Amino acid sequence: MNLLFLNFKGFVRLMTNGVYYKKTFCIGRENVPEKGTPVLIASNHQNALNDALGFLLTINDRKVHFIVRANVFLLAKAADKYLRMLGLLPAFRMDHEGLNAVSNNGATFHDSEEALIEGKTVVIFPEAGHQWIHWLGNFSFGYTRMAFEAAEKTGFTKDIKILPACNHYSKYFDFKTSLLIRYGTPISLEPYYDLYKVKPRTAQREVNKLVREQISSMMLNIEDVDNYEAIDYIRTSEFGDRFAASQGVGKDDLPARLESDKKLVAALAAQEDTAKLYEDSMNVVEFLKKKRIEDVNIAKNSSALSVALRFIGLLLLSPMALACVWPSVPVWIIPRYLQKKTGDPMYRGSFLIGISCIFTLRILGLVTLLAVGFGLSFLGHAISWPIAVAYVLLFPAIGLFEWAWCYWCRELFRDMRARKVRRSEDGRSMLRLREDIFSRMDKICKSE
C-alpha cells in the first residue's frame, strides 16, 4: 500500500471514527479470509459512500477494491485517477449514465476479475443502488458471474470465495450515530465449479441464494415495505426502547439493539391482522410530523425547570458558538446544499464525510493557516505560526462543539413544542392513542 493511500486511510479513519460516528462496531472480522485469498465481499447497501468506508476501515491488512457508481469518476480526469488509486472501480448504470455507457462495465469487470485472480479483495453491492430503508433489495447476478469468470480464467484452479457482509446504522441521517459492520461465513465456489461448467446460470442462482440468505439473516430486513414507516415508528419509539431494555440491551450497544429490533419486527410479521395497529401508528407519525417533534421528545416529558436551565446554558454558550462559526458553517452547509441538489437524502452523510471531512476541511485548514499565520506576523505577533497551527488542529473540536450547540438548541425547541402538545386537547388524544399502541404491542410481544 503506497504512502498516499495510507495517508488517505488514516485521515478518513480519524474523521469517521473520531468525528463523524459516535461508535463503530465490527463483528466477524475473523471470518475475513487471510490476505492473498481471492475474496469477493457482497454486502447490502444501506447508505452511499459510508458503506464503502465502513469496509475500508475494518480490513486493515490490505488494500480493498470497491465497485461503485460511475458518476463520481466522470467529474474530471484527476478524480478518475485519484479514485482508482484508492481502489475504486466504476459501475455504469443505464438509468444514470445511459445505455451507451453500460458497455464500459466490461473493463470494470475485467479489472475486478484480475484483482481476484491476483488474490485481492473486492467489495460489491449486489443491489446496485443504495436503499433508503432497512430492507434488502433485489440482487443482480453480476457479482456471481464475475466470481465464476475469475475462477474460469484460472482454469478453475483457484478457490474464489464470496464473503457475505452487512452494514447497519443506528440512524441514517443524523451525525454522531453508530455504525455496525458484520462479516458472515465465507462461501467457497469450488464445490460449484462442475455445475457451473454445464449450467452456469443454475450455479450462480444457488450461490446467490446462499449469499442473500446470509446477508438477510445478519441485517434488519423489514420486508413489509408497504407498512415500513409504521413498523419503523414502533421500532424506534419509546416502546422499542422499552422492548430493547427488557432484552438486556444497553443504550449504546448497537449489535444487541439490532437483534432486539429483529425480534420485534419478527413478532409483528407473525401477526395475521396488523392493519389497525399500523393505521393508528401512522396517525401518530403524521401528528408528530405536523408538530415538528419526535417520539423521544414526548417520552422525555421535560419539565419547565429543565427547559429554562437548558435555555440559560445555551445562551451562555452562544458567544463560543458564534466564535466557532468558522470553519463550521461551510463544513456543514456545503454537504447539505449538495445533498438537496441530488434529491437523495442518503447522500447527506456521504457528502459530509467525502467532501467536508476529506477535502473541504483540508482546504479551509490551509487557507486559515496561511491567513492567521501571515496576519499575525504582519501585526508583529511573536508566535504567529504556532498559534495558526494550533487553531487549525482544533478544527475538528470546533466543528463538534458547533454541531453540539445547534443540536442542543434543536432538541430544546422540540421539547418546548412537546410540552405545548401535552397540554393541548389533540395532543392528549394522541398520547392516549400512542399508549394504546404500546399496550397492544406489549400483548403481541408477550404472545411470541
Question: Each PLM stretch: what is its role?
Answer:
Residues 142, 206, 314:
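Short, well-structured alpha-helical interface segments that form or flank functional binding sites
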Residues 202, 209-300:
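Long, charge-rich alpha-helical interaction segments
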Residues 296-330:
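Transmembrane alpha-helical segments and their cytosolic interface motifs
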